[in-house]
């Protein structure tokens, strides 16, 4: 074992782009694991004999676990470094996927899903913080490239569901195939040269860290960035999770709605690529405001038109515009400087998942008790609030923040 560890240390991958490639790949497979649940909700509810409201509670509980691990990851990164936290997150995802393979009872499903979400929480913060820190001079483009992995994973997930339905494979076995890439990525991590944690982290250093984090979290500019993330990810996750359930109310079959979902997620990939080009020429805030405004218009149009073809076209246009806006928000938050990448990443991700905890449950409750159109009502309201918040955020307030953070 010592020889293997020594060999890994000697042969570490040192390429400048290796961290970006690893982050992209890890976020790709992490996204598939995270987004596979939404399209198979109709199968899970039948297989485990539970209602949509109960499923919404499970998703909210899992998202709460994700929220806690996200908050913890921001602090743990400062102490243990990127490699150990990424390794731990990957192991949790591996364990969660393995548990979901054997989820033939509701108890096993809840435990395995919670473990999976905890691993995702660690990896979302650690991988994006790593990219933001390592490529700070080109942060907007690098963050967008890394997050394209998330978007591609969201495309692959519904396609896997359609394939599993076509070959009559149980939804549990999808997670067996998702566990394999994590084993490979854990092995690659051993060879990857990644910054470590702080050595001899003292109690005074921990106190200073909490002091700085408190000031950053309470600053109006950072707080508004967190609120944008809160609203935006809630919109994205509720729309994606309850997508097939919404189309089932229109008498569209699961395999067809999964393909439509794949079209939507393909549009989000296209949107990420477009933003990757536009971010060089347009200020982050202006691009964010335009994207959210157009997203509202196209989602409202998709809701108003009853023709399925027209509805799919507007959903595609919605996907192009709604994609990549968390990356822009994160890039705006990083204007504070590379020193505080970990805490900004942790705050924005925690805010995102806090919104998902509430709105996933609300979407499930309203879909079960009122109408499956409820998710669109919720998302349209969130987009409208987003437009207002983005319009009032002001980057100039940041110039005073560095004076307030008085730590060594």
Question: PLM ranges: what are they?
Answer:
Residues 336-372, 379:
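A late C-terminal transmembrane helix in Major Facilitator Superfamily
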Residues 145-193:
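Helix-loop-helix hairpin linking two adjacent transmembrane segments in secondary transporters
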Residues 68-106:
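Conserved MFS/SLC helix-loop-helix module at the cytosolic interface between two early adjacent transmembrane helices
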Residues 112-148:
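Cytoplasmic helix-loop-helix junction between adjacent transmembrane helices
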Residues 283-329:
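C-terminal transmembrane helical hairpin of 12-TM major facilitator-type secondary transporters
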Residues 69-81, 271-283, 367:
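Helix-to-loop junctions at the C-terminal end of transmembrane segments
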């Amino acid at each position: 074992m010592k020889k293997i560890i020594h060999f890994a240390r000697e042969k570490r991958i040192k390429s400048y782009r290796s961290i970006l490639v690893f982050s992209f790949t890890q976020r790709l497979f992490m996204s598939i694991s995270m987004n596979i649940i939404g399209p198979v909700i109709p199968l899970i509810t039948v297989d485990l004999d539970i209602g949509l409201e109960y499923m919404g509670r499970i998703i909210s509980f899992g998202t709460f676990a994700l929220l806690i691990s996200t908050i913890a990851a921001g602090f743990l990164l400062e102490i243990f470094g990127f490699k150990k936290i990424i390794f731990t997150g990957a192991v949790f995802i591996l364990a969660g996927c393995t548990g979901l393979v054997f989820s033939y009872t509701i108890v096993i499903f809840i435990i395995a899903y919670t473990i999976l979400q905890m691993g995702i929480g660690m990896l979302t913060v650690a991988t994006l913080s790593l990219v933001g820190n390592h490529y700070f001079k080109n942060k907007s483009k690098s963050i967008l490239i890394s997050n394209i992995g998330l978007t591609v994973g969201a495309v692959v997930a519904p396609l896997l569901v359609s394939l599993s339905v076509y070959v009559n494979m149980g939804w549990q076995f999808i997670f067996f195939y998702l566990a394999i890439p994590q084993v490979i990525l854990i092995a690659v991590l051993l060879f990857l040269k990644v910054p470590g944690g702080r050595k001899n982290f003292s109690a005074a250093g921990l106190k200073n860290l909490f002091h700085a984090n408190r000031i950053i979290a309470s600053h109006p500019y950072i707080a508004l960035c967190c609120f944008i993330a809160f609203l935006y990810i809630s919109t994205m996750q509720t729309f994606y999770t309850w997508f097939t359930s919404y189309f089932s109310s229109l008498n569209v079959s699961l395999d067809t709605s999964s393909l439509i979902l794949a079209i939507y997620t393909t549009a989000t990939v296209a949107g990420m690529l477009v933003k990757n080009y536009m971010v060089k020429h347009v200020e982050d805030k202006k691009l964010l405001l335009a994207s959210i405004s157009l997203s509202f218009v196209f989602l409202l149009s998709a809701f108003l038109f009853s023709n399925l073809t027209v509805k799919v076209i507007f959903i595609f246009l919605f996907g192009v515009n709604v994609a990549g806006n968390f990356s822009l928000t994160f890039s705006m938050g990083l204007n504070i400087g590379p020193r505080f990448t970990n805490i900004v990443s942790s705050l924005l991700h925690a805010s995102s998942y806090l919104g998902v905890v509430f709105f996933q449950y609300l979407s499930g409750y309203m879909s079960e008790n009122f109408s499956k159109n409820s998710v669109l009502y919720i998302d349209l309201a969130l987009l409208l609030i987003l437009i207002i918040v983005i319009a009032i955020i002001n980057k100039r307030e940041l110039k005073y923040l560095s004076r307030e953070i008085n730590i060594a």
